[in-house]
């Protein structure tokens, strides 16, 4: 196999950016999401830190189909002052990496990734959850997409 083809092929097996879906916040812990082509029920639920049962109950639907593109559905809409964190997903697991930036706090990162600061601290060997260093990468749950 040619080296350039091998490099291209292996690039598809490595980490990939996982961009989360966003919602229009209503101020009540809820919001609206507009269904896009290629969406599936499990991925939408994972992006909004909920279950397919909640989406079914709130929207009276049991799945997402292609004829629902551009349909607005109600979702839990977690509010984090406008910051939406994404992860670099490991294609071989449900985890990924998040790059810590100045001003980040572990509790806020945990909130965005549908987990707790204690869980993130354990996953990353962080002894003091109140202190995390900017410009470092940590492992985070990254199940969407």
Curated annotation (Swiss-Prot):
Record organism: Verticillium dahliae (strain VdLs.17 / ATCC MYA-4575 / FGSC 10137)
Domain notes: The LysM (lysin motif) domains are small globular domains involved in binding chitin in eukaryotes. Vd2LysM contains 2 LysM domains.
UniProt xrefs under PROSITE patterns: LYSM (PS51782)
Cited function: Secreted effector that enables the plant pathogenic fungus to manipulate host defenses for successful infection. Binds chitin, suppresses chitin-induced immune responses and protects hyphae against degradation by plant hydrolytic enzymes. Chitin-induced polymerization of homodimers forms a contiguous ELP2 highly oligomeric super-complexe that may precipitate at infection sites to eliminate chitin oligomers, and thus suppress the activation of chitin-induced plant immunity.
Knockout-associated phenotype: Shows significantly reduced virulence on inoculation on tomato but not N.benthamiana nor Arabidopsis plants. Seems to leads to enhanced colonization on Arabidopsis.
Protein name: Secreted LysM effector Vd2LysM
CDD domains in the record: LysM
The keyword Acetylation belongs to this UniProt entry's keyword annotation: no
């Amino acid at each position: 196999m040619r080296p350039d083809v091998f490099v291209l092929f292996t690039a598809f097996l490595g980490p990939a950016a996982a961009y989360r879906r966003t919602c229009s916040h209503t101020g009540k812990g809820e919001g609206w999401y507009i269904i896009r082509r290629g969406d599936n029920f499990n991925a939408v639920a994972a992006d909004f830190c909920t279950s397919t049962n909640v989406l079914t109950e709130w929207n009276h639907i049991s799945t997402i189909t292609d004829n629902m593109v551009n349909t607005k559905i109600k979702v839990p809409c977690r509010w984090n002052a406008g910051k939406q964190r994404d992860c670099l997903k490991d294609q071989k697991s449900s985890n990924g990496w998040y790059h810590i930036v100045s001003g980040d706090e572990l509790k806020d990162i945990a909130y965005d990734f549908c987990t707790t600061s204690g869980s993130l601290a354990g996953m990353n060997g962080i002894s003091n959850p109140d202190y995390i260093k900017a410009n470092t990468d940590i492992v985070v749950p990254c199940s969407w997409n």
